[in-house]
A protein has these predicted regions:
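Conserved N-terminal entry element of GNAT/NAT acetyltransferase domains
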Residues: 1-16
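Conserved acetyl-CoA-binding loop of GNAT-fold acetyltransferases
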Residues: 12, 128, 144-154
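Conserved GNAT-fold acetyl-CoA-binding loop/helix
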Residues: 29-51
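A short helix-loop-beta-strand connector motif used in the catalytic cores of GNAT acetyltransferases and
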Residues: 50-64
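Conserved beta-strand in the GNAT
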Residues: 65, 71-80, 96, 101
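Conserved acetyl-CoA pyrophosphate-binding loop and the N-cap/start of the following alpha-helix
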Residues: 106, 110-118
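Conserved GNAT acetyl-CoA-binding A-motif
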Residues: 116, 123-135
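Conserved beta-strand-loop-alpha-helix junction that forms the acyl-donor binding cleft
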Residues: 131-142, 156-158
Length: 158
């Protein structure tokens, strides 16, 4: 970790942190989707809580919150799952990075890059090399700098 990114605290979320994690998740979704505060996110919050309660307990999700003293300024998460083994991924284990966010006042300080490195390290420590993510236009250059590349062999049903 270099530069300004070292001045902050990166905390791996524990089950007792679910309240703040759900609140942060809703804030990230509002920001990413440009949703006003009057948009009802109750169902998303309820489902997010249920997801985190299960996934943090069974290890199928790791979340990181970034603090500037007591203020949350960033977040990131990685979900783990299995598919059928393939030639390129004989274990079938995969990881998907999501919920990456940095408060606009703290951007361009290396916070997202360091959060990403912690999440990738967590996956590698679990023996998972097949790591993917969905990138916004703003985030794409940072992900490419880290080593992520566009995928040509996958499609999504619309």
């Amino acid at each position: 970790m270099t530069g300004a990114a070292m001045n902050f605290t990166y905390k791996t979320v524990m089950p007792e942190d679910i309240d703040i994690l759900v609140t942060t998740r809703i804030e990230v979704l509002r920001a990413a989707n440009k949703l006003d505060d009057d948009v009802d996110m109750t169902e998303v919050a309820v489902q997010s809580r249920a997801y985190y309660e299960k996934a943090l307990k069974d290890g199928s999700h790791t979340a990181i919150l970034v603090y500037d003293k007591e203020k949350i300024i960033g977040a990131g998460g990685i979900s783990y799952f299995e598919v059928m083994p393939t030639y390129h991924n004989p274990t079938g284990k995969k990881a998907y990075i999501m919920n990456m966010y940095t408060n606009p006042a703290y951007r361009r300080m290396g916070i997202a890059y360091h959060t990403l490195s912690l999440l990738v390290e967590d996956a590698k420590n679990k023996g998972i090399d097949a790591i993917s993510l969905e990138a916004t236009e703003m985030g794409r250059p940072m992900y490419e700098k880290f080593g992520f590349a566009g995928m040509k062999d996958e499609m999504e049903l619309k």
